[in-house]
Amino acid sequence: MRPYLLLTPGPLTTSESVKTAMMTDWCTWDEDYNVHIVEEIRKGLVQLATRKTDEYTSILMQGSGTYCVEATLGSVITPKHKLLILSNGAYGDRMGNIAEYHEMNYDMLAFDETEQVSVEYVDDYLAHNAEITHVAVVHCETTTGILNPLKEIAHMVKMHGKKLIVDAMSSFGGVPLDVEELGIDFMISSANKCIQGVPGFGFIIARKSELQYCKGVSKSLSLDIYDQWDAMEKGHGKWRFTSPTHVVRAFKQAMDELAAEGGVEARHARYCRNHDVLVEGMRSLGFKTLLKDEVQSPVITSFLYPDKEFDFKEFYHQLKEKGFVIYPGKISQADTFRIGNIGDVFPEDFSRLIEAIKTVAK
């Protein structure tokens, strides 16, 4: 029995069957786990990411999505490289923090949190800064819910002959994309987002030809994506260090449920319906969205406080008592709160949410 729905961008509400999948113990040395679960996940992730499956591989890494972002940047960027980070929110900024810690040679182009990354500006920057070798960008910036124009960014980056690293943490599995068609070299995501698993590991979809250059680059033992991949390849799914077995098994169940739903296109359509029901209902109650509709993702939606007297903590706790957990805002330029549209939640859940907000907001 669910005490409440998590209307958050991850961790999120999971199905009962995903939770039940964690009720069995697994041996990390056994082929039932490594071959029939881990390797099936690795293969399935590549199939979700592209039709050109022979050109890409996947690496699973223990920890949160940020662990995978740091592992990727730390395994890809050498002292001979120069990284350009495109940021319009907290998660783009976090890549900058990682680059600082690793003393990488990098530049950052910062854009307003409520505006998409400007393709024209980045194009001009790359045209005048030939020393840039890699570009990193967040696809869906959950700071606000904005969806960056990945197709246009990727085309422009490839036109300039640069390598592309994409943080698709909150979009992969819920927003259609093909890494090969877009020319993405490394794409990063996490178990507890649109594929609707639980927290505990993330993953990288890597172009095989680029991954080979990562050997010996990382200065970290545990956050080395090449060594992790090499161990999984040679060990048929065996992780270098203890893997989160229950989380991995739950993720396999979540992937099966994604396929049963009809794949990424069908899930994207459900998330869009969730978002539409939410926004229509909230606007009918007088709430305003932070972002323009044309740049809004279906993943998470930011709403402005209705007035100066609005008490988010009180609003939050009253909604929680009615069975809904939402998210505080994360930007400095406006008072906002956020409601996630992803997870094992459906349009009828958002209709119930609107009814709850109608009583709470009186």
Curated annotation (Swiss-Prot):
The protein's required cofactors: pyridoxal 5'-phosphate
Family, as annotated: Belongs to the class-V pyridoxal-phosphate-dependent aminotransferase family. PhnW subfamily.
Known partners and oligomeric status: Homodimer.
UniProt KW keywords: Aminotransferase, Pyridoxal phosphate, Pyruvate, Transferase
EC top class named in words: transferase
A GO BP entry: organic phosphonate catabolic process
Annotated GO MF terms: 2-aminoethylphosphonate-pyruvate transaminase activity
Protein name: 2-aminoethylphosphonate--pyruvate transaminase
